[in-house]
Amino acid sequence: MVKYILKRLGLLLLTLFLIVTLTFFMMQVMPGTPFSNPKLTPDQLEILKHAYGLDKPLWQQYFIYVGHMFTGNFGTSFIYTNQPVITMIAQRLPVSMQLGTQALILGTVLGALMGKASARRKNGLLDGIFGFLSVLGISVPSFVIGTLILLYLGFNLNLFPISGWGTFSQTIMPTIALSFAPMAVVTRFVRSEMIESLSSDYILLARAKGLSEKEVVNKHALRNSLIPMLTLIGPMAAGLLTGSVLIEKIFSIPGIGAQFVDSIPAKDFPVIMATTIVYAVILMVFILVTDILTAIVDPRVRL
């Protein structure tokens, strides 16, 4: 098991290295410059480039950046003068993590309940409704769902605050919007697993022993369907990471996703680089946890 974990960890570290390298050099070929103020004189522009180390050869900039990265130094923002990037991320990351956690919990719980109900009423009306919601959650981007929720629940019905962060009511609409994707994935997975479980021999044996239908479904079929669901952590985390970027912008949430969107047109390379790395590390942690849980549930994957 230890050998398997070390192997997976090594592959993830290699992937992270490639992401850092590709992102760094992609930043260099992006058109434009963060110092595009027409009021800057050539001398002032040279001073700024020297201050941020942009006058050094590209290969030297790369090795300096990688060396600083391992010490947690992501440089300072080009736009927010003298503001360390690591400080900016530390202030906003908890907001994004809270939003993602709430959406993951809500989506998982609702998905498990909907999948259970769909399996028990296979091909029925409820199964059709939940199936439609699952297709909606998988096929429609979260920012489209978020926009519709904002227009209907926020502007038309005025049920919740339309923007900001700080109170529980402000988290409701973005959490619902972001939870659609994990809800859809879990619903389809639990439905499929439970339909298979309900027709298995051990379920027939449980019914033959006189157990109530509630006990058969909850203690046997549902429980055995939820164990393999641990393998979905990685894909759902990826969906939440990519979906939260625009959701934060739509609902004016002060998370790293909104900061990332703002930094792109501003050509704030240190913020873009650091945010990309943070997203990659978070995703890789989820993938590693998923791989470990999968290896525990199914030892064959270690081979």
Swiss-Prot record:
Record protein name field: Dipeptide transport system permease protein DppB
Gene name tied to this protein: dppB
Transmembrane segments: 9-29, 62-82, 93-113, 129-149, 166-186, 227-247, 269-289
Record's bilayer topology term: Multi-pass membrane protein
UniProt cross-references to PROSITE patterns, sorted A to Z: ABC_TM1 (PS50928)
Lineage: Bacteria, Bacillati, Bacillota, Bacilli, Lactobacillales
InterPro entries for the chain: BPD_transp_1_N, MetI-like, MetI-like_sf
Subunit structure: The complex is composed of two ATP-binding proteins (DppD and DppF), two transmembrane proteins (DppB and DppC) and a solute-binding protein (DppA).
Location(s) in or outside the cell: Cell membrane
GO cellular component: plasma membrane
